[in-house]
Design a protein with these regions (language model features):
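Long, low-complexity N-terminal extensions
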Residues: 1-239
Length: 239
């Protein structure tokens, strides 16, 4: 009997080679992501929205296979709608994160999905949960994921402070994502943010020409070589 080769099937899939992030602050959470979607080296979409609504005040950030993460998010959204109908109350952020973790773990051989779940609920207030590829559930004050995250862990460790308000947290997420996008070839485009509090969800958009700019380096050797060639040319003219 023929079997499906999952590795071959997934070889040409569309991936969210990405930078995603969620940070908790005193009255809510800020989530953010870049907008680049790739198929190998080809940029399939430059303005993807990787912040996915799963319930009123619960969102997820998606990294990995676009098809896998969309399917998982749709399933969780369905179950949370059923939950709220059955119990007459909105689900907690932990309930949503547990559903994501269960689906990712039980199907880890078929899925490539890294998820960050964040939001606000009446039980605990703001919270952030990280579900890495393969499953697992970790509550953290901040979480980053995707291919761009490897370049900014040190920046996050050195910069993050407890007790921040909304404005400081938004700037932290914006700067972190801009740094990741400047180093990771699979991240890019624009930055999409969402601020989730008891009052609701506020969406923010930062176009590419308004991203924070940091030191981007310069080729010192190249400048020295130009000076050398100029000097040699002058010597030849004088000779």
């Amino acid at each position: 009997m023929n079997t499906v080769d999952m590795q071959q099937l997934k070889a040409g899939e569309v991936n969210l080679g990405t930078s995603i992030m969620a940070v908790q602050f005193d009255k809510g959470v800020v989530i953010g992501a870049d907008s680049r979607t790739t198929t190998g080296s080809y940029i399939a979409n430059r303005v993807t929205d990787k912040l996915t609504h799963v319930h009123d005040r619960v969102y997820c950030c998606r990294s990995g296979s676009a098809a896998d993460t969309q399917a998982v998010a749709d399933i969780v959204h369905y179950y949370l709608q059923m939950y709220s109908q059955q119990y007459g109350a909105p689900p907690s952020v932990h309930t949503a994160a547990t559903l994501f973790e269960k689906l990712c773990y039980e199907n880890k051989d078929q899925l490539l999905a890294g998820i960050i779940v964040a939001g606000w609920d009446r039980e605990v207030g703001p919270s952030v949960y990280n579900i890495p590829v393969g499953g697992g559930l970790f509550r953290q004050p901040w979480a980053i994921g995707g291919s761009g995250s490897t370049y900014v862990y040190g920046y996050c460790d050195a910069t993050y402070q407890e007790g921040w308000g909304k404005d400081e947290t938004v700037n932290f997420v914006k700067n972190t994502l801009a740094l990741a996008m400047s180093r990771d070839g699979s991240s890019g485009g624009v930055i999409r943010l969402a601020v989730i509090t008891e009052d609701g969800v506020e969406r923010l958009f930062i176009p590419g020409n308004e991203l924070p700019r940091f030191w981007e380096g310069k080729e010192v050797l190249g400048q020295d070589m130009n000076k050398t060639f100029t000097h040699l040319a002058q010597m030849e003219i004088e000779a």
